[in-house]
Each structure stands twice: as C-alpha cells, then as structure tokens.
Amino acid sequence: MDTQAFRRSLHHSDRYNRRGFDSPTKRAQALEEAYQSDLISSIRDNGFTYNKGRLNIKLAKAFGFCWGVERAVAMAYETRRHYPNENIWITNEIIHNPSVNDHLRKMNVKFISAKNGIKDFSLVSNGDVVILPAFGATVQEMKLLHEKGCHIIDTTCPWVSKVWHTVEKHKKHVFTSIIHGKFKHEETLATSSFAGKYLVVLDLEEANYISEYILGRGNRNEFMNKFAKACSDGFDPDKDLDRVGVANQTTMLKSETEEIGKVFEKTMLKKFGPENLNSHFLAFNTICDATEERQDAMFSLVDEDLDILVVIGGFNSSNTTHLQEIAITKNITSFHIDTPERISVEENSILHKPLGLDLELKNNFLPSGNINVGITSGASTPDKVVADVIEKLTVIAS
C-alpha cells in the first residue's frame, strides 16, 4: 500500500479531523480545570521543592503531561461534547494513565476490545465516531475505519507522525527501518505499519547482536528465531540489512536511541567504507523533545541527595518505565506507582511495581526522621495525581 497517498486522501476526507473542535484557549481552560493543581503550581514557583515538617520533596524540573498528551486528552473530551449522542469508540487507551481512561469510560466512550492482540472492530458501524489515541493507529486500522464510513478523530502526537514520515522515507529509498522500540507497543505497531522492510530493536544488546550479523559473524536460524515477531513479513537478514535507516518509538531512552544509531553507523562504515556510507545508512532525528526533557530532568534529580524516589505513571507506560530505569542506575530506592491509591496512609505502605516484576507491597516505606523524597511522573500523568501522592506522603510524615 502507498501509505503516503492513503494518508493524504484521508486528511482531505470530510469524515477526518485532526484539529479538534475547541479553540486553544477553551482547550487549555478545560484541561486546567480537570487536571491542574494549585499545590504543584506553588511547588514549581518554589524551585520545585516542598518542605513540610520532616519531609523534603524535590520534584523533577520537567514531569507530567506533555503537550502531545494534553492535545490528545483534550480532543477526546471535545469529541464527546461535539457528538453528544453518537457511538464513540477509541482504538486503544488514549494515553497510558488509568484515571484518564476511566474518565473516558464514564463519558460513555467505548474501547475496542482485543483478544490475543487482535482488535475486534465488528461492532463499529457506519457513522460511528472513532478516536485514534496519542500513540496513533496502524494504517490498516485507519483504512478499515475509513471504509466503514466512520468519523475519525485523530489525536496522534505530531512527534509520532514525524517518525512515520521517517520510515516512509526509508521505504521510498529502499532502506530497511531499524526501529528502536518494543515490538508489541501500540506506537511501534503503528510506526511499523508505515514502513517497508523493518526490524524492531529493543536495546543496545540487540543492536550489537545485529551488528555482528551484518559483519558476517552470526547464525541465520538463530537470528530469525530471535527476531521472528519483530520484523516485517518476508524479512531476509542476508539482504535486508545492507541499507538501513534508524527511527524510534518516541518514548524510548534518548541516550540508548543515540547509541543504537551510532552502532549501525559504525557497522556500515566498517562494512562498506566511508565513501559508501550514505548509500547504506540514513541518519535520523526522531527523538521527542518532551521525552528528552523529562529524561534530562530525571538525570538531574537523581544527582540530588535523595532517600527514596517515587515515579508516577501507568505501569504500561514506556516513558515512565525509562524514568524508573534511570533511578535504578543510580542505586536509588525507587517506587513506581500508577495511582495515589497505591499508597496506604494508615499502614505507611506502598504497592509498587519493581522493574520487570509483579506488584510488590512495601511496608514502612517512608522511614523515620528527616527524609528527602524525589518525585517525577510520566508524560501521561496529570498534576492532580502528583499532588495527591504528595499529600499522602505529607500525612504519613506527620
């Protein structure tokens, strides 16, 4: 499929909307009423610090809702107001935040069900309204919904769309897209649907493994078994890794994406020589500004004198998970929670998710004496949620 041509035609359809319905001023006011916090505003004004008794809280200098998330959430709410009586569906969680998604359910926005990773669009009918989430949707889903005669409200983050343009450029010039991401993640599924040949790479270890194969030091069967679910149909590592371009899931760790890009650039340089590098490697710039800002702020926060660190965000949120990884690299005791309800004031306990593990209950997690607590949150976490966490910590400390 010519994905560029399809997107152009979709954008000209009178059943497609990617701008929303409210003015920017009205949109900002609605979000402020729903999710902003006076406490968080005052903490920002106080140099991102908050002192209450024995508790000293230090907030990351960039955290919480990014503008892409704000835009998606606002457009979803606007859609219900604009279509008060129509069936409204959403193809996935609007963002990775349970409270926001629960609010949409209360507004009678229906979520497309999925079984074994396959979405069921059978209940979606002509004239229904369908919201595409901030992560985007696959081109196949867009085509299906367009053919069904649905009104499509596209809240895809522009940074995600930028990555789609990048992989389409790779396809046009017959380059394989190396996508730094998680192959099951909604954003990467969408991005790969716009690519030609592609290979999804999780981390630096996998990048180095592929590099070794490109340089002739690998086993084909082992390679294909390793990446069976992370590559395009008919992928041939002996042919499709001669010309590569790098792109990324926008929520991945910035420093790792850059390192992976360097691995493939050096590999192609070694195999084909400097005079042929541009024919075999395409440079990239698809790192999201908001992701970069939050990660940089987290690196600064973990350099502070902290006793514990609380990371707030959906458990399936990639950008939040990477913030937790930064804390772990500094050996700081950290707790990843998705809602304030994970903290029990009465028990001084926290039900948190260690990286890569199941939920775990930690009793007496807030120690006695003076304590320095670092706090950050993922790009899908409203300020009000962060404020509720701080208020619970304050009560425990008192």
Curated annotation (Swiss-Prot):
Binds 1 [4Fe-4S] cluster per subunit. Pathway: Isoprenoid biosynthesis; dimethylallyl diphosphate biosynthesis; dimethylallyl diphosphate from (2E)-4-hydroxy-3-methylbutenyl diphosphate: step 1/1; Isoprenoid biosynthesis; isopentenyl diphosphate biosynthesis via DXP pathway; isopentenyl diphosphate from 1-deoxy-D-xylulose 5-phosphate: step 6/6. Keywords: 4Fe-4S, Iron, Iron-sulfur, Isoprene biosynthesis, Metal-binding, Oxidoreductase. It catalyses: isopentenyl diphosphate + 2 oxidized [2Fe-2S]-[ferredoxin] + H2O = (2E)-4-hydroxy-3-methylbut-2-enyl diphosphate + 2 reduced [2Fe-2S]-[ferredoxin] + 2 H(+); dimethylallyl diphosphate + 2 oxidized [2Fe-2S]-[ferredoxin] + H2O = (2E)-4-hydroxy-3-methylbut-2-enyl diphosphate + 2 reduced [2Fe-2S]-[ferredoxin] + 2 H(+). The keyword Glycoprotein does not apply. InterPro entries: LytB/IspH. Gene3D superfamilies: 3.40.50.11270, 4-hydroxy-3-methylbut-2-enyl diphosphate reductase, catalytic domain. GO terms for biological process: dimethylallyl diphosphate biosynthetic process; isopentenyl diphosphate biosynthetic process, methylerythritol 4-phosphate pathway; terpenoid biosynthetic process. GO terms for molecular function: 4 iron, 4 sulfur cluster binding; 4-hydroxy-3-methylbut-2-enyl diphosphate reductase activity; metal ion binding. The keyword Disulfide bond does not apply. Dimethylallyl diphosphate binds at H96, H185, S317, S318, N319, S380. [4Fe-4S] cluster binds at C66, C157, C288. Isopentenyl diphosphate binds at H96, H185, S317, S318, N319, S380. (2E)-4-hydroxy-3-methylbut-2-enyl diphosphate binds at H96, H185, T250, S317, S318, N319, S380. Its cofactor is [4Fe-4S] cluster. Its EC number is 1.17.7.4. The active site is at E187. CDD domains: lytB_ispH (cd13944). HAMAP family: IspH. PANTHER family: 4-HYDROXY-3-METHYLBUT-2-ENYL DIPHOSPHATE REDUCTASE, CHLOROPLASTIC (PTHR31619:SF5). Belongs to the IspH family. Catalyzes the conversion of 1-hydroxy-2-methyl-2-(E)-butenyl 4-diphosphate (HMBPP) into a mixture of isopentenyl diphosphate (IPP) and dimethylallyl diphosphate (DMAPP). Acts in the terminal step of the DOXP/MEP pathway for isoprenoid precursor biosynthesis. This is 4-hydroxy-3-methylbut-2-enyl diphosphate reductase. The gene is ispH.
